[in-house]
Amino acid sequence: MHEKLTTRFAPSPTGYLHIGGLRTALYNYLYARKNGGNFLLRIEDTDLKRNSKEATKAIIEAFKWCGLEHDGEVTYQSERFDLYKEYVKKLLDEGKAYYCYMSKEELEELRAKQEAAKERPRYDGRYREFTGTPPQGIEPVVRIKAPQSGEIVFKDGVKGEVRFKAEDIMDDFIIARSDGTPTYNFTVVIDDALMGVSDVIRGDDHLSNTPKQIVLYEALGFKIPQFFHVAMIHGEDGKKLSKRHGATDVMEYKEMGILPQALLNFLVRLGWSHGDDEVFSLEDLKKLFDPYHINKSASCYNAKKLEWLNTHYIKTLPFEEIKRQLKDLGFDLSVYEKAGFLLDLLRERAKTLHDIINGAKSIVNAPQNYDENAVQKFVNENNLELLQAFANTLKDPKTGKDFEDFTNDFLEKKEAKLKDLAQPIRIALTGSAVSPSIFEVLEFLGVDECKKRIENFLKVRGK
């Protein structure tokens, strides 16, 4: 019996961490945390030819970025081959598994006959009860003695009761290859059992593996965990999510300026809901998440929803957290004077962290050039003269409200309107016709810097 609720995430390090994988990890993490249990990380790196140290590092980095803390040390399957061999031997000694000496040519011949007869390709069990002399020159595989009739039945936490007919889904499948390396289904069962995994939340692409794993659990005398098979994430066109739908690598989202809080909030809702609520902090989710309420049907990736959530978190997260995330992207906000004011200036309109970075640079650094389209659209002889007069009379405003009052008084005296002056000021100060509130930009820069930038712009325009 499992002493403590324990979940795991077990990726193969053959590529980057896909957002579907991150959702699986998140579901396992939340369920463990809700129940005061353990959340384990296991790297399934038995495929020594395809494994990548960079991929392993990227998976761990993605966890760190998202704030998903696993319990204990990371388990690497590549360090457990001796353990797997012990359990292969155990099954052989107990007569629950056997050596199969079928050659590659014999296997191909069998499959050709089955295809010709329009039968499902399957191993015919010829070495299941073999007691003769093994053929020479053949390195055998090890096969499990699987049920040949009846049903494999289990209660899935998402899909309900699932039934597989033994004859439809399995033959005596291989648990150890001819070179002695164990197969995927075998290592998963050994590790989940020995690591005390009580609940397995994973994609429903693993559903067909489950009956084979149950056969192994029973053969080894291990307790079968509770399974939850989650439907895949689809693109907005209804097809399985892929790169053509946008970014799929978790760390690409970081580089795009997406906050981890937004990404996790977005992913948890792709398959799970709590009433009509849309926004959940990680702490909220640790209390609310229940895998028994995961939707049975596939979820649809909605880029606009992710953008909306990212905008929300940019507006609402504490200054120190935004500053930390910006620094992680190579932008140190703290080097600027009035950094908190600058962030508040920019975060209201920002959809990504790059909007803050680009906005900060455009305000803090005097423009080296000016958006020519904006100049053509908003600047003319009349408002250049108005801009010159504005700079000449600008003396003592300090706050945004001061600048607003000063500007309104100035425009009233000149019998002009704000639309005649606002865009030329924006262009002069930032090089662009797009910026936060012009009065707050004026406050941030201060009178001297504003006058300096306006004078420089007028000089460039020949004034």
From Swiss-Prot:
ATP binds at residue 243. One of its GO terms (molecular function) is zinc ion binding. GO terms for biological process: glutamyl-tRNA aminoacylation. It holds the Pfam family Anticodon_2. A motif ('HIGH' region) lies at residues 11-21. It is found in: Cytoplasm. A motif ('KMSKS' region) lies at residues 240-244. It comes from the Bacteria. Its EC number is 6.1.1.17. SUPFAM superfamilies: An anticodon-binding domain of class I aminoacyl-tRNA synthetases, Nucleotidylyl transferase. The keyword tRNA-binding does not apply. The keyword Cell cycle does not apply. InterPro entries: aa-tRNA-synth_I_cd-bd, aa-tRNA-synth_I_codon-bd_sub2, aa-tRNA-synth_I_CS, aa_tRNA-synth_I_cd-bd_sf, Glu-tRNA-ligase_bac/mito, Glu/Gln-tRNA-synth, Glu/Gln-tRNA-synth_Ib_cat-dom, GluQ/Sye. Its main location: cytoplasm. One of its GO terms (cellular component) is cytosol. It is an enzyme of class 6 (ligase). It catalyses: tRNA(Glu) + L-glutamate + ATP = L-glutamyl-tRNA(Glu) + AMP + diphosphate. Keywords: Aminoacyl-tRNA synthetase, ATP-binding, Cytoplasm, Ligase, Nucleotide-binding, Protein biosynthesis. Catalyzes the attachment of glutamate to tRNA(Glu) in a two-step reaction: glutamate is first activated by ATP to form Glu-AMP and then transferred to the acceptor end of tRNA(Glu). Belongs to the class-I aminoacyl-tRNA synthetase family. Glutamate--tRNA ligase type 1 subfamily. NCBIfam families: gltX_bact (TIGR00464). HAMAP family: Glu_tRNA_synth_type1. Monomer. This is Glutamate--tRNA ligase 1. It comes from Campylobacter jejuni subsp. doylei (strain ATCC BAA-1458 / RM4099 / 269.97). The gene is gltX1.
